[in-house]
């Protein structure tokens, strides 16, 4: 499972160097898509297959399910690391996430997240200011 947060720079062609700690995680390719809270999600291909299975199980008769699947799939883009361990982020996804020149690449269970640094700081500050409710953490073992 990938973990940690790494600040990087996006070049003028929309490429970012993948942190060494995450390269093996995505060595077979990855799927980039819109994430929650205005970030991007990057799933390794095997992980994306599991996500697809879960999304395919959502009811087509539910408007909210259809809207979420549309949001998630329509932004998806397949990518691979180049010979310099860079991943190219499509302009549409960079615009969605507010990524210009700087990015935070963060690990999360089963995926990576690409964040605008200001959004990242705000997301972390929000959790510090108002931690998750105890019932959400009932099964968490520290």
From Swiss-Prot:
Every SpoVT-AbrB domain range: 5-47, 76-119
Recorded GO MF terms: DNA-binding transcription factor activity; transcription cis-regulatory region binding
GO biological process, one term: negative regulation of DNA-templated transcription initiation
SUPFAM superfamilies found in the cross-reference section: AbrB/MazE/MraZ-like
UniProtKB keywords: Cytoplasm, DNA-binding, Repeat, Transcription, Transcription regulation
UniProt-listed Pfam families: MraZ
GO cellular component: cytoplasm; nucleoid
UniProt cross-references to InterPro entries, sorted A to Z: MraZ (IPR003444), MraZ_C (IPR035644), MraZ_dom (IPR020603), MraZ_N (IPR035642), MraZ_sf (IPR038619), SpoVT-AbrB_dom (IPR007159), SpoVT-AbrB_sf (IPR037914)
Cell compartment(s), UniProt: Cytoplasm, Nucleoid
Family stated for the protein in its record: Belongs to the MraZ family.
Complex formation: Forms oligomers.
UniProt-recorded name of the protein: Transcriptional regulator MraZ
Organism: Deinococcus radiodurans (strain ATCC 13939 / DSM 20539 / JCM 16871 / CCUG 27074 / LMG 4051 / NBRC 15346 / NCIMB 9279 / VKM B-1422 / R1)
